């Protein structure tokens, strides 16, 4: 036992003798502390390092998915600091966080192995105090904003809340000819998402690592999600800081595929949304086997020197027969006018290509896919007002072009854009109707409130409305009166924003809102009640509630 203790002391002595500048930084890499923090440790391939000394004092040099090392925020083990200090302290001298300053917003001091270190705060109060931040998001309170700033390693500030009460595209479009707009301060004007540079198409060998960066810009900062296009399985929405098999979405919205397999080939779509609009950009990945010796035989053309090719091959039926090992290749779809992946059993078909670029160069006519390209601003600052066709909204929209490194989905006028791309013609909207009489609706609803709409967030086919509560008329499941709730967030899970029901996009008066509660969340369905309130209608509802009309109706139904 004495020899074991002596061995421990001998092992600890060299580390204690090292100066602060020679030792590793305090803490551990996120994935060493908790496997669920793996993505955070892999969050970037850009801040390369060789040791902890290349990073700031609150960071560690950790492994990333690119096979290199990157600086990331160090982590400490919750509740372990006292035990570590009790075992490792010397001379009984008290070490504390007093006077130790954490410069990163949202970081707090804790003891780690007897030394004060900074860590991101992970506990915030439950009292709501909605805080609008400079990243365009609204946080439950300021503590949550500070914690997010620490996790991202950035600075966030509280800003004046901006409420978006109208449809993203309801403002009148600029008239032709469009005058060149003057650049404006991004903090004072919203702008729909645009790409800084055009999407890149990539090819990798089996087992390789590739990454796609959706360098989207916009105000407020767009939220980035990824989807892999597939006709054979349901599409999965991939969000930041998540891992899907061998695919990782980093904290900056970068998609990384490591140990690439043939089934990873395909088109990965980046979807960027903010309150001003939505954008989609497609990135193609082709995974080829080392057995395909001829793949890079013609580096100048980038095409393999294989079988003879005929233009008729592009319209040939896809051969999916079973002739051996399953493979994933590309084919040209004449109906969609673009290239896509398909799985086959190794049979030699005519409409079959190893890579997206081979398929595109062989079959896709010049200008055929222009209308599916995203809006690209480019790195220059010679601002021009241009128009592009948005394949998600199916209409031409204005964007700000920097003057260089764009693409062909950029037109000088709206008329030119409409003539080149198939613009969607909106159908006339029918008036929204709720089911039954107002008293029946009141009694069948889980909640009924009178509130002022303060914020409306619109997604592609869903949304969220925030109300400032003025009266709680009925509440069966949420305890709004018990907790003295002042704000209520209501989910809109099924909305056609071209003809929304209930239509609250243009209403700025106090509303009478009735809906249901599912899993603790307030929800408005297409047939739910949401209309401006009148004193007369409100008086009748109060009278009905005082007389317990809902209880009477329930007994009659039973």
Curated annotation (Swiss-Prot):
Q: Between which residues do disulfide bridges form?
A: 29-62, 45-66, 49-61, 55-71, 120-150, 124-143, 132-161, 214-270, 314-363, 323-347, 339-359, 371-421, 380-404, 396-417, 429-499, 432-501, 443-550
Q: Which GO terms describe its cellular component?
A: extracellular space
Q: Where in the cell is it found?
A: Secreted
For this protein's source organism, the top of the classification is: Eukaryota, Metazoa, Chordata, Craniata, Vertebrata
Domain annotation BPTI/Kunitz inhibitor: ranges: 314-363, 371-421
- The record places domain NTR at 421-550
Q: Name one Pfam family in it.
A: I-set
**Gene behind the chain:** wfikkn
Ranges where the WAP domain occurs: 22-75
Q: Which SUPFAM superfamilies match?
A: BPTI-like (SSF57362), Elafin-like (SSF57256), Immunoglobulin (SSF48726), Kazal-type serine protease inhibitors (SSF100895), TIMP-like (SSF50242)
- GO MF terms, alphabetically ordered: receptor antagonist activity; serine-type endopeptidase inhibitor activity; transforming growth factor beta binding
- Domain named Ig-like C2-type: residues: 193-286
Q: What is this protein called?
A: WAP, Kazal, immunoglobulin, Kunitz and NTR domain-containing protein
The Gene Ontology biological process terms listed for this entry are: transforming growth factor beta receptor signaling pathway
Which positions are glycosylated? 503
What start and end residues bound the annotated signal peptide?
1-17
Kazal-like domain residues are 114-163
Q: Which UniProt keywords apply?
A: Disulfide bond, Glycoprotein, Immunoglobulin domain, Metalloenzyme inhibitor, Metalloprotease inhibitor, Protease inhibitor, Repeat, Secreted, Serine protease inhibitor, Signal
Where is the sequence biased in composition, kind Low complexity? 184-194
Give the protein's function.
Protease-inhibitor that contains multiple distinct protease inhibitor domains. Probably has serine protease- and metalloprotease-inhibitor activity.
In which residue ranges is the amino acid composition biased (Pro residues)? 174-183
């Amino acid at each position: 036992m004495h020899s074991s203790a002596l061995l421990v002391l001998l092992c600890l002595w060299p580390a204690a003798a090292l100066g602060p500048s020679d030792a590793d930084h305090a803490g551990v890499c996120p994935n060493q502390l908790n496997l669920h923090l793996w993505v955070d440790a892999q969050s970037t391939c850009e801040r390369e390092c060789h040791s902890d000394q290349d990073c700031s004092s609150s960071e560690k040099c950790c492994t990333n998915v690119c096979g290199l090392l990157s600086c990331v925020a160090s982590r400490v083990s919750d509740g372990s600091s006292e035990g570590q200090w009790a075992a490792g302290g010397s001379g009984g001298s008290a070490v504390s966080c007093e006077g130790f300053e954490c410069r990163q917003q949202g970081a707090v001091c804790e003891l780690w192995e007897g030394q004060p270190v900074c860590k991101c705060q992970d506990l915030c109060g439950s009292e709501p105090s909605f805080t609008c931040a400079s990243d365009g998001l609204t946080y439950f309170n300021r503590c949550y904003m500070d914690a997010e700033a620490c996790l991202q390693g950035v600075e966030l500030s509280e800003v004046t809340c901006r409420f978006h009460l109208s449809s993203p595209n309801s403002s009148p479009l600029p008239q032709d000819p469009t005058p060149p707009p003057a650049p404006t301060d991004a903090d004072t004007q919203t702008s729909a998402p645009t790409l800084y540079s055009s999407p890149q198409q990539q090819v990798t060998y089996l087992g390789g690592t590739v990454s796609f960066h959706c360098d989207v810009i916009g105000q407020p900062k767009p939220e980035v999600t990824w989807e892999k296009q597939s006709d054979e399985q349901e599409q999965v929405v991939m969000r930041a800081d998540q891992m899907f098999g061998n695919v990782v979405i980093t904290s900056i919205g970068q998609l990384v595929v490591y140990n690439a397999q043939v089934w990873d080939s395909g088109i990965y779509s980046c979807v960027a949304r903010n309150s001003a609009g939505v954008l989609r950009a497609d990135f193609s990945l082709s995974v080829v086997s080392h057995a395909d010796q001829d793949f890079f035989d013609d580096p100048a053309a980038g095409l393999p020197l294989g079988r003879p090719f005929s233009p008729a091959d592009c319209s040939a039926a896809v051969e999916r027969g079973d002739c051996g090992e399953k493979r994933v290749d590309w084919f040209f779809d004449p109906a969609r006018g673009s290239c896509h992946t398909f799985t086959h059993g190794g049979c030699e078909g005519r409409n079959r290509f190893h890579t997206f670029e081979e398929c595109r160069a062989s079959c896709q006519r010049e200008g055929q896919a222009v209308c599916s390209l995203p809006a690209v601003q480019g790195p220059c600052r010679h601002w021009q007002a241009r128009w592009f066709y948005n394949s998600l909204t199916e209409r031409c929209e204005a964007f700000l072009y920097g003057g260089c490194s764009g693409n062909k989905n950029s037109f000088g006028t709206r008329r030119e854009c409409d003539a080149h791309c198939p613009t969607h013609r909106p159908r006339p909207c029918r008036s929204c109707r709720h089911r039954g009489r107002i008293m029946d609706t009141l009694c069948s609803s889980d909640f009924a409130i009178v509130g002022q709409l303060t914020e409306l967030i619109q997604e592609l086919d869903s949304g969220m409305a925030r109300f400032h509560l003025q009266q709680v008329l009925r509440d069966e499941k949420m305890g709004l009166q018990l907790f003295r709730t002042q704000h209520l967030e209501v989910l809109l899970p099924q909305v056609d924003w071209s003809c929304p029901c209930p239509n609250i996009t243009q209403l700025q008066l106090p509303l009478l809102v009735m809906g249901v509660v599912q899993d603790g969340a307030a929800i408005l369905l297409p047939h739910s009640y949401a209309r401006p309130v009148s004193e007369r209608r409100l008086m009748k509802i109060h009278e009905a509630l005082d007389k317990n009309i809902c209880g009477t109706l329930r007994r009659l139904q039973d």
